[in-house]
Amino acid sequence: MSLDIVILAAGQGTRMRSALPKVLHPVAGNSMLGHVIHSARQLQPQGIHVVIGHGAELVRERLAADDLNFVMQDKQLGTGHAVAQALPALTADTVLVLYGDVPLIEVETLQRLLAKANDQQLGLLTVTLDDPTGYGRIVRDEQGKVTAIVEHKDANDAQKAIKEGNTGILALPAARLADWMGRLSNNNAQGEYYLTDVIAMAVADGLVVATEQPHDAMEVQGANDRRQLSELERHYQLREGRRLMAQGVTLRDPARFDVRGEVSVGRDVLIDINVILEGKVVIEDDVQIGPNCVIKNTTLRKGAVVKANSHLEGAVMGEGSDAGPFARLRPGSVLDAKAHVGNFVELKNAHLGEGAKAGHLTYLGDAEIGARTNIGAGTITCNYDGANKFKTVMGEDVFIGSNNSLVAPVEIKAGATTAAGSTITQAVEAGDLAVARARQRNISGWKRPEKIKKS
């Protein structure tokens, strides 16, 4: 069975009170539409067709990709009208209709729905709610077969009492779709062309409407305002927390933990409160992450420890290495096994060899640091001349004294030592001691200046 997916993303979202198109509002660091597209791709369709309208150019700009076909809906005349705009591009056997503001839909739910769709049967995703206000109601006959969907504004009192609501997500036989679209009418309270009207048409044409439901009603929850958006965010985070805990992660408090990307984890991982994981994060076995950390596009090898209030981006921490508290590892930072980065240390494009240490109050940029080298407090690499970046290289077993300025390009070879307070501008040979500071001079009998008293 070949598959085309149509994603409806043309709505304005006036209740968001925003210049940003509704479908671009983020959930967990990705736009709502981005989440839907991600789920759609996992179904491996032959085409993904995104119907856009309000803010169309911005939506195209943010989400442009070779596998997406953007279809313009100039006037928002209803869901049926939106799907009709994509008709010329649909060539598969089955068409799945999704919504750009329903970001939590699970791929497994969609797979179950698609399994019920064929040339003689529609797949319709419904949801049973205690309060289905706003949802179209699923009307069934005495045998329990679906006969129609009635929109809330068009429903009578008996129909409004029905608890089963329409999610709008359905799988249709493509061969029938053009005929049904041509028969749609806007004779309703909204004056719109409802996609849901194809259900009654399908029944009249002798097709069966097979229903499926999500395991969790939040899967089909949309966001029309910022309160609903925040509810989606919190539900997504709790869902991700449950997923990670099932894989062997201890979360001190799943309600105070955020995932904003793709996270893979090992076993016996400990994550404290207020940790944010962004982008692609790999966490191996026995890793510990302290409170209030932000970790983005980073790999943490087995047994690595990230202490409180640290910020890591584009970094790799080797096995048994540690960073923090208050450490900042910027893109290109690599710590080999058992390397140590302490409090108020910043690394950028720096590689610390096995067992190397930078304990505190240090900036290391564009640096290659050998195994077991020790960097004294207050040391900085002077790597930028206002136009170009230069590299600092330190061999193995180097000892850098406190409060050093290492003016790149410069090399300090294996086993060398630099004295505290030095400004190193030239190469230091292996095993040498470099002293690059003014000699101390004491002035006897010196008196401090006195403040002039105001008259």
From Swiss-Prot:
Which enzyme class? transferase
The UniProt record lists the EC number as 2.7.7.23, 2.3.1.157
The GO terms describing molecular function are:
glucosamine-1-phosphate N-acetyltransferase activity; magnesium ion binding; UDP-N-acetylglucosamine diphosphorylase activity
Q: Which SUPFAM superfamilies match?
A: Nucleotide-diphospho-sugar transferases, Trimeric LpxA-like enzymes
- Keyword Nucleotide-binding in record: no
Which pathway does UniProt place it in? Answer: Nucleotide-sugar biosynthesis; UDP-N-acetyl-alpha-D-glucosamine biosynthesis; N-acetyl-alpha-D-glucosamine 1-phosphate from alpha-D-glucosamine 6-phosphate (route II): step 2/2; Nucleotide-sugar biosynthesis; UDP-N-acetyl-alpha-D-glucosamine biosynthesis; UDP-N-acetyl-alpha-D-glucosamine from N-acetyl-alpha-D-glucosamine 1-phosphate: step 1/1; Bacterial outer membrane biogenesis; LPS lipid A biosynthesis
Under what name is this protein listed? Answer: Bifunctional protein GlmU
